[in-house]
């Protein structure tokens, strides 16, 4: 054996590391069920599991001076493996989400609300980036090694979660000399989850005291419809190849093709390699969308007889991938590497939470009448954590998901990706020439934010304009 004996630690390192991550989530779940304030905090189990491991690793480092996850029992390079798991969790999770069959069609009004949700998502990224850049531009004159463009990580850590925060932190660290960039990104994402959990609970309690909402006291378990697991014309659950194995194979095949595209483009243009591999989830989404359309066409022409993709199982794959991404990302944080940035990080975290809260509150009040609070909790949770956090907060005010907010979250991904893509390009441009390019990026974000909000509030803006023109016409006629 080239790897040594089966009892050697390097054979078991990855298994023990993954087992530790999963065990931390089991412990976190037990603590949430047993401790009242944790149960009421709405903190996701994966986040709590990551915090438990971060605390253990930090205490170990304080006592021994060594990195806990780099012990031989974890293979000797556990921190690097945690970052790899975080990176791949993002791509695999998005591919599985994209492969899910579309569940329903909507009328014109609902399509407009879904578009508005996507526009709100991207506008949320932009306002986070604007305030984040303003903060880090100022602190870059005071804090050593802090680059002015670091503030863009706020919109990725809060708006898109651990995976993208790590991606851009890594790009800034490797390509632009941002010392501790990866840990900076992971910490911003962790602060986002805390903002979602703590801020969400505070506002929930406030609205409940005012009598504006009714919070569900009991955890509701929704019965699984067997048609979700074994739909019409789908391949059998236990055929010659297990149905779950088929779903995993599809997801990983899409991811492999995505790697080929990233590798090819990165080899053709070496300067874009880090950017290409930072877009692993986006390229995965595009390849998955293409495959989904090909399968739909083949099924329509009766070339493929059965449905191979199952939405229920794809949900389970994406849920597992995102759980692993979150717990691994938080556990990978090395606090000593970001000690010099703590004041900056705390200010970014607090300002990010406040400005996201205010902006989403305004949008939901004016654009989502009839389910303002449901839409708010879904959007606030998503724009400070992930889609899963948004669903957790939404469940507190809409336990059965009867409002349109849950569908808005699911179907807003396409407009969010389309309108959000320029933001990713701006984020890679921002650090190129230090303060100058960062200021240009800030100006672009402000201009794009204004443009998107004109589009978002198009009905209100043009309705008022038409009303004013009508009044002017009436005055002229009366004269």
Regions found by a protein language model. Give the residues of each.
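Interfacial helix-loop-helix linkers and transmembrane-helix boundary segments
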Residues: 35-42, 67-83, 100-119, 296-314, ...
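Hydrophobic transmembrane alpha-helices of secondary-active transporters
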Residues: 24, 51-58, 80-110, 287-296, ...
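Alpha-helical membrane segments and immediately flanking helix-loop junctions
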Residues: 123-127, 135, 143-178, 184, ...
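Entry/N-cap segments of selected transmembrane alpha helices
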Residues: 101-133, 246, 251, 331-361, ...
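Structural signature of hydrophobic alpha-helical transmembrane segments
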Residues: 9-23, 79-93, 150-155, 277-287, ...
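C-terminal transmembrane helix pair
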Residues: 325-329, 333-335, 345, 349-460
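Intrinsically disordered, low-complexity non-transmembrane regions of multi-pass membrane transporters
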Residues: 1-11, 18, 206-245, 296-308, ...
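Transmembrane helical segments that form the transport core of multi-pass membrane transport proteins
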Residues: 254-367
């Amino acid at each position: 054996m080239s790897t040594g004996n089966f009892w050697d630690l390097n054979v078991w390192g990855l298994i023990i590391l993954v087992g530790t991550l999963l065990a931390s989530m089991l412990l976190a779940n037990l603590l949430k069920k047993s401790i009242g304030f944790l149960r009421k905090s709405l903190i996701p189990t994966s986040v709590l599991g990551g915090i438990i491991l971060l605390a253990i690793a930090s205490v170990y480092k304080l006592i021994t001076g060594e990195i806990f996850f780099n012990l031989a029992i974890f293979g000797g390079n556990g921190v690097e493996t945690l970052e790899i798991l975080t990176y791949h969790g993002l791509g695999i999770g998005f591919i599985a989400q994209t492969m899910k069959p579309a569940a329903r069609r909507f009328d014109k009004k609902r399509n407009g609300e879904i578009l508005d949700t996507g526009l709100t998502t991207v506008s949320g990224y932009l306002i986070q980036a604007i305030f984040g850049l303003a903060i880090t531009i100022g602190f870059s004159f005071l804090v050593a090694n802090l680059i002015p463009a670091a503030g863009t990580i706020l919109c990725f850590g809060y708006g898109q979660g651990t995976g993208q925060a790590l991606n851009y932190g890594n790009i800034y660290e490797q390509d632009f000399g941002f010392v501790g960039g990866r840990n900076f990104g992971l910490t911003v994402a962790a602060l986002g989850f805390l903002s979602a959990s703590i801020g969400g609970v505070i506002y929930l309690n406030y609205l409940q005291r005012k009598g504006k909402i009714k919070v569900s006291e009991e955890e509701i378990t929704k019965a699984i419809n067997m048609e979700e697991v074994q739909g019409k014309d789908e391949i059998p659950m236990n055929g010659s190849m297990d149905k779950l194995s088929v779903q995993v194979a599809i997801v990983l095949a899409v991811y492999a093709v995505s790697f080929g595209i990233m590798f090819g483009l990165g080899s053709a243009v070496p300067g874009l390699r880090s950017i290409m591999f930072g877009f692993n989830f986006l390229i995965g989404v595009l390849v998955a969308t293409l495959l989904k359309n090909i399968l739909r066409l083949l099924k329509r022409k009766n070339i493929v007889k059965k449905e191979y993709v199952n939405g229920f199982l794809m949900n389970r794959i994406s849920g597992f991938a995102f759980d692993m991404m979150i717990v691994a990302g938080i556990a990978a944080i090395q606090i000593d590497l970001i000690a010099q940035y703590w004041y900056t990080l705390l200010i970014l975290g607090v300002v990010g939470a406040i400005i996201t809260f205010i902006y989403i509150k305004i949008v939901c009040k004016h654009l989502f009448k009839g389910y303002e609070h449901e839409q708010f909790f879904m959007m606030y949770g998503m724009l400070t954590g992930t889609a899963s956090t948004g669903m957790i907060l939404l469940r507190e005010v809409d336990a059965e998901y009867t409002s349109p907010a849950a569908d808005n979250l699911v179907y807003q991904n396409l407009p969010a990706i389309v309108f959000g893509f320029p933001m990713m390009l701006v984020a890679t441009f921002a650090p190129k020439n230090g303060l100058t390019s960062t200021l240009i990026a800030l100006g672009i974000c402000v201009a794009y934010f204004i443009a998107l909000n004109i589009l978002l509030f198009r009905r209100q803006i043009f309705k008022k304009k038409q009303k004013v023109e009508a009044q002017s016409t009436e005055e002229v006629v009366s004269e």
